């Protein structure tokens, strides 16, 4: 019979260290973890209760509605038999739930009744990103896939309106989509797409047409000479390139005056791309390792990813304010739970490959308390381990000493033998 125990297979020292660290962290209860039956790949606020409820996409092939205060599953949306990767809400009264899946389709349900609605079939590979908008009186669904295509749908009829592909710069697998709330109008959506390449693209979409939106060069651009040369030659800059490799998340800061674009990348950074500077990077946050997720508040920039750590940065100074080390596998998504009436402080919700959903206070006092709790627990555990090692060494030494000692009977026999030799 073959063994599935990892310890029975060849592992590098790094792999062993990671596995041992994961085993140590697995039992922790920081963030009041809710353990789900499968990996959690995405999370969005519940539009009906954004301060206390979320929707999560699970690798087990379902979407769950979770009350973050009671830690209970209040609804299950089923149908897919493969992982669900991404979520969005839209449609009439924001009452339709959309979910992209590994089965190459987008599923939809009535958010209130859980009744399955239409499926959108048009991609030739995994669907990895979905977002909703409106064009005139029509609700619109936009999906992006591993097939390197963006598809725009009439959400009501299921009719495919457009298929977007970059004709000049190779666009890889789609990772995330966002709608620009400043440039979009009643009859036109400006879509931002991120993919498994360094290029961020913008698209102008109407019911009848679409085009790739050039990036406006300004004298304040990073390279004014290059901007002037491009302008004089008639060349258009069609992509924003501020990262070195894949961009996993794009997020507009709707709380800020300029509504700048924020990004998270596999190059280990999160960045603020400033609208008035043609989306050139201004603030850079060096998270380290792949950054899968980013969330924003008035005070903080929050990042998470493969390192398993949540890092909280001061928005004003850029300083690292806190490191929350609780998940024991990759963090896949972050979302801020915000009371629309402002009656309660913001709360961060994090989800990951470790099958857990956790929540964290984002007020200064609450955040400090969490960091101190994790630090104190780590110190106590380290002391326990040191004591255990000392005890183990002491027992080993005692055994060695005992092995070197003879019983009274053995000593008498040895003395008799020595007398016989004399």
Where are these regions (language model features)?
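WD40-repeat beta-propellers
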Residues: 63-67, 106-109, 130, 150-154, ...
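Canonical WD40 repeat/beta-propeller blade segments in eukaryotic WD-repeat proteins
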Residues: 35-46, 81-90, 125-133, 169-184, ...
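Short coil/turn segments that connect the beta-strands within blades of beta-propeller domains
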Residues: 50-52, 92-95, 137-139, 187-189, ...
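Terminal intrinsically disordered, low-complexity extensions flanking WD-repeat/beta-propeller proteins
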Residues: 2-25, 211-231, 288-290, 297-299, ...
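Short C-terminal beta-strands that terminate individual repeats in beta-propeller domains
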Residues: 30-35, 73-79, 116-122, 160-169, ...
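A short helix->beta-strand "capping" segment at the edge of beta-propeller domains
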Residues: 11-40, 70-72, 231-235
């Amino acid at each position: 019979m073959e063994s599935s125990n990892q310890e029975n297979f060849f592992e590098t020292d790094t792999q062993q260290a990671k596995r041992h660290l994961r085993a140590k962290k697995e039992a922790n209860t920081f963030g009041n973890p809710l353990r789900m039956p499968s990996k959690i790949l995405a999370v969005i606020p519940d539009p009906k209760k954004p301060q206390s409820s979320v929707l999560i996409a699970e690798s087990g092939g379902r979407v769950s509605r979770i009350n973050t205060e009671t830690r209970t599953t209040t609804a299950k949306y089923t149908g897919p038999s493969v992982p669900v990767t991404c979520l969005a809400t839209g449609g009439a009264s924001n009452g339709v739930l959309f979910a992209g899946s590994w089965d190459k389709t987008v599923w939809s349900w009535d958010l209130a009744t859980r009744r399955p609605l239409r499926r959108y079939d048009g991609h030739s590979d995994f669907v990895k990103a979905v977002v909703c908008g409106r064009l005139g009186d029509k609700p619109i669904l936009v999906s992006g896939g591993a097939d390197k295509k963006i598809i725009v749908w009439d959400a009501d009829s299921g009719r495919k309106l457009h298929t977007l592909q970059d004709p000049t710069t190779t666009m890889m697998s789609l990772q995330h989509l966002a709608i620009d709330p400043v440039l979009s109008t009643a009859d036109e959506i400006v879509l931002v797409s991120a993919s498994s390449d360094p290029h961020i693209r913008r698209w102008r979409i109407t019911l009848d047409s679409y085009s790739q939106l050039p990036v406006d060069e300004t004298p304040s651009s990073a390279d004014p000479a290059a901007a002037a040369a491009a302008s004089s030659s008639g060349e258009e800059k069609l992509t924003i390139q501020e990262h070195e490799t894949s961009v996993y998340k794009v997020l507009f800061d709707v709380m800020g005056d300029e509504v700048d674009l924020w990004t998270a990348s596999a190059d280990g950074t999160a960045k603020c791309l400033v609208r008035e500077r043609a989306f050139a990077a201004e603030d850079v946050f060096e998270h380290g390792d792949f950054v899968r997720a980013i969330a924003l508040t008035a005070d903080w920039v929050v990042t998470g990813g493969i390192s398993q750590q949540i890092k909280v940065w001061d928005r004003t100074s850029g300083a690292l304010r806190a490191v929350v080390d609780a998940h024991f596998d990759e963090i896949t998504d972050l979302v801020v739970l915000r009371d629309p009436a402002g009656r309660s402080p913001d709360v961060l919700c994090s989800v990951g490959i470790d099958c857990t959903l956790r929540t964290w206070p984002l007020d200064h006092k609450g955040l400090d308390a969490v960091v101190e709790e994790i630090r104190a627990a780590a110190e106590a555990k380290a002391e326990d381990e040191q004591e255990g090692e000392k005890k183990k060494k002491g027992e080993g030494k005692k055994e060695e000493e005992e092995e070197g000692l003879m019983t009274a009977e053995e000593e008498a026999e040895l003395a008799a033998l020595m007398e016989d030799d004399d």
